[in-house]
Regions:
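Nucleic acid-binding interface residues in structured DNA/RNA-binding domains
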Residues: 1-92
Length: 92
């Protein structure tokens, strides 16, 4: 995030910056960790509109991948060792 980012953007960027390859979190977990519980939709909008963040490591609360980007997200997650089946992250 650039220095002129909002406090919310900065907090989300910090959370995303701590994610390691193969680590998957939900939009809600990112929002809560950033100090904004309940702001899961705002996290989604921010990821949609921002470049350079590991968006593929963030999924819905049910493990579903980003609509319209499922193939790319599954490929990126698979390259990091994350199992995906039927458009969802598979635990284990």
């Amino acid at each position: 995030v650039t220095p002129d980012g909002t406090p919310f953007e900065s907090a989300v960027a910090e959370v995303l910056g701590r994610l390691l390859p193969g680590e998957v979190v939900t939009y809600g977990e990112v929002a809560a960790e950033a100090g904004h519980p309940g702001a899961h939709r705002a996290v989604g909008r921010l990821l949609r509109d921002s470049d350079g963040w590991p968006w593929w490591r963030v999924v819905t609360s049910t493990g579903r991948l980003v609509p319209g980007l499922e193939i790319e997200q599954a490929q990126r997650l698979g390259a990091e060792g994350v199992r995906v089946a039927n458009g969802r992250v598979v635990a284990g």
